[in-house]
From Swiss-Prot:
It is a lipid-anchor. Phosphorylation of Thr-72 in the switch II region by LRRK2 prevents the association of RAB regulatory proteins, including CHM, CHML and RAB GDP dissociation inhibitors GDI1 and GDI2. Its cofactor is Mg(2+). InterPro entries: P-loop_NTPase (IPR027417), Small_GTP-bd (IPR005225), Small_GTPase (IPR001806), Small_GTPase_Rab (IPR050305). GO terms for biological process: antigen processing and presentation; cell-substrate junction organization; endocytic recycling; exocytosis; positive regulation of cell projection organization; positive regulation of corticotropin secretion; protein import into peroxisome membrane. The modification Phosphothreonine is found at residue 72. This is Ras-related protein Rab-8B. It is an enzyme of class 3 (hydrolase). The gene is RAB8B. GO terms for molecular function: GDP binding; GTP binding; GTPase activity; signaling receptor binding; TPR domain binding. Belongs to the small GTPase superfamily. Rab family. A motif (Switch 2) lies at residues 63-80. The keyword Transmembrane does not apply.
Amino acid sequence: MAKTYDYLFKLLLIGDSGVGKTCLLFRFSEDAFNTTFISTIGIDFKIRTIELDGKKIKLQIWDTAGQERFRTITTAYYRGAMGIMLVYDITNEKSFDNIKNWIRNIEEHASSDVERMILGNKCDMNDKRQVSKERGEKLAIDYGIKFLETSAKSSANVEEAFFTLARDIMTKLNRKMNDSNSAGAGGPVKITENRSKKTSFFRCSLL
């Protein structure tokens, strides 16, 4: 059967239990919202194909369990991820504080140049906010990561978040292909991991 997409990107949603990762996934993949989701057991995924710059990109989005007892299972999925969204709940201070621990997990288990984005979810619940937008932005700047506040319930910034991450991945792939073409003088293209550019790339376009 003919392939119906030009690229396949594997994305990962990580963060504490209850921050809304599953709700974000369902909002993006099915444009649906459900307040009765139970906590993810282990890992699950959804697929949505989008179009960017005339190319069809199949997004395979993995939703991971936030509980400690599933950590060994979920970290096994970090390695093949091309983009990772770190999600916290703006009404839950602890989930924000733990973003640093999740970043440490990425550094230990994921590819060194994986694209990352921090999402402050549940921004529709501003009356219960414990984490200011400014604190989220500062944390993102400190790590050289893009940042958005989202709401799976109202759908605010959900599309933008996934499209931005996909575009960043595609930009990186295109640059690697161009670099390979220049180096190979027309030879076969081989996409390789470039560890030395990790920090400088993320700081090109903040927030």
